[in-house]
Amino acid sequence: MFKNKIKHYQQTVLIFGLILFSDGLSGQEQKKAYVDPYLAPIDTSIVFNIIYPPLTEREGKSLDIPFPPNEHPRLFFRAKDIPALKEKKTNPHMPDCWKRIVDNAALQTDGKLQQDGKKHNMNNKIIDAIEARAFMYAFQKNLKAGKEAFEALQNYNKTLLIDYEKADVCRDIGRVILTNAIVYDWCFDLISNLQKKELICQMENLGKQLEIKWPKLAQGSIVGHGTEAQLARDMLSCGVAVYDEKPEIYNLAAGRIFAEFLPARKFFYAASYHHQGSSYGSYRFQWDLWITMIYDKMGYPEIFGKDQGKVPYRWIYSRRPDGQFFRDGDDFNELYIPFGKTWTITGAAVSGSYFNDPVVMNEAIAENQIGHNGLFDFLFVDPLVPVKTGSSPLTRYFPAPLGLMAARTGWGNEISSNTVVAEMKIGVYNFANHQHLDAGNFQIYYKGPLAVNSGIYQGKTGGYGSDHFVNYYQRSIACNTMLIRDPDEKFNWHGRELANDGGQQFPNGASEPVNMLELLSKDYKTGQVLSHASGPDSVKPEYSYLKGELVEAYSDKVNSFRRSFVFLNLDNPDVPAALIVFDRVNSTNKNFKKTWLLHCIEEPNITENVTTVARLGKGYHGKLVNTTLFPVAGNLVIQKIGGAGNEYSVNGKNFPQYTFNENNSADGAIWRLEVSPKDAANIDLFLNVMQVMDADENNKSLVVEKIETEKYAGVKISDRIILFSKDGEISNQSISLKISGDKTYKVVITDVQHGNWKVEGLKDTVCQVRDGQNLLSFSAPEGNYKIIRSLMK
């Protein structure tokens, strides 16, 4: 148990333009009002008399918070770590890191920044040089380097210019705070008391100009810029460095982290993911790793728990053979990474090292991550962690608050690979910000992206908040889910009225949840996983099954929307896999049009109830064939929407967007398939069977046969039979099944109650169904069978 030794320094007084600290406080001084430094003009040369407010529950009041050790250095490493670091310096995997540190320290600079005509003169090369010199002193007692580091930092601070209109300028401001904290801690005994106070002033004055408006902590703890470096790395580092001289900084930063960051991370890390997706997810995950490393080096390991180490698996499983990830939320990777270059998992090297995970470490090495950030890679990365490739199970379930299943047929990493990758998402919580309205979404890749998300995050018509962004890109209409259109429904984003796409509502009007209390008490819950299973082999499963209820993602226009996915590894070189999607949608008004969506890059071809989607060019050569079994032929409308001038259409109005440059890896999906029933009804069933293959004219798709009984609907494809309950409920009733054909079929029946089920007609065949899986499977030749729930234990 951590002992709380937080020191309370309630007052600072301004003397000779510098902040001095008072250890003894009178009762009257303790009652001084909080002074808001942000109300003053923004000027780094002005020193403010900051009176810190009393800690509240949001800042960890009454929590047992760990405190920094009484020694220097203590930020990122301690004296006891130096022998191991010296051994690491000689490791054959570390020469790039050490060389970069040495080269940075040797940079010819006195720290002074150019000011001629500049509004913003941040210089990361000088930052790196200052930190490298400070490290040379703390690590090797190089006195000359230490003195040069401090002198250069003083010059840097005096000549720094900040353009407060620069986008995301808080990231630059925070980086300077970090450098000040590092020099303060690593060169502590070279700095006089007066100079220490100057550095503290500088860090506080910079801190008040962050978006979190230090010490207000104006932003949230779950999502948004407030969860990035500002608090997690920059102000926390400042607090650790100056704890003995001004503990209020640490108390405030650490208090918010332990009160709000920690429970939120434990909540979503349980699902082995970060909710901000394929770009912002790993970007923000790295800041949580900084918190982990700061505390670990102070002697407090794994403050977020071991689940943090599993987060990179979300991106490992969503990686396509072309080196990219399935798109998840706002994605900037596809806009700025050239086609053909492997996308990286930010933080994989640190996470793989810290949690001793060979699979994650292999990702980092394959992505050539180690050595680019010489100093921090040297401090945080363990080159002795082994690597492992291609041994993970092909299916992985990511539980609530995500509720997603990723299924693969292999781990191929070439664009010509035969590996199929699919994602099936229920989506239990929507955290807003960069997350999309995509509950129920699916994506498929085989020799090219075949079923994908649509839209462009940033482009010539704008970025976050543009018309394209709020009316199309973040909306359900841009995903492979279901639309239920109430013509009178209103949609808004932060109070801004939007086009009616018929999809899901922005939770809480798109406002970001500040903390767990808001997340759990407001309407951020979008779904519930009802069942999930894969098997029979756990490493190479033949089937992967996921089912959920999605009514919470929609307005009251929907009574129920249950979606079931079954991914089949067919082990067939011509048609390697299939994805079956079964939907039961119950709307409150029979006239609300229901539309099943599939987005693709090239124009689809529709022949009766069969749609073909190909992906050619750029080295791709894949094809998807979708057979629609429900709605039935007489009640079926299939149409394609898209093409030039109609790429991102909502109810006939296009919301255009264009990438900034041609050298990108954007999928560029400008077509979609819409499947709807012709007749109005409250309850509609949808059953779509997608199979993938090479895009050769001679390559024929498998025969797809519909199966329907009074209670079940399903499909026979290849040697597989898959059945779903038509009413969407779990059943304990007996099932009659007639199998015809000249082969042995692998049967999967979903929506069955847990317990033992006997297959009459197959000698001694009893299937055990586990609670939460609600699926039974067996193999059987042609014949008549009755499956009965047994009372035997």
Go through each PLM region and give its residues.
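Catalytic and substrate-binding regions of extracellular carbohydrate-active enzymes
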Residues: 369-611, 615, 680-695
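Mature N-terminal, pre-catalytic/accessory segment of carbohydrate-active enzymes
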Residues: 27-96
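Glycine-rich (often Gly-Gly/Gly-Pro-rich) flexible segments and glycine-rich loop motifs
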Residues: 328-365, 477-484, 489-519, 613-649
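Aromatic-lined, polymer-binding surfaces characteristic
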Residues: 74-82, 94-319, 324
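Carbohydrate-active enzyme catalytic cores, enriched for enzymes
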Residues: 242, 282-451, 678-685, 697-777, ...
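Terminal accessory/anchoring regions of large secretory-pathway or extracellular enzymes
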Residues: 536-539, 549-554, 566-793
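Bacterial Sec-dependent N-terminal signal peptides
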Residues: 1-30
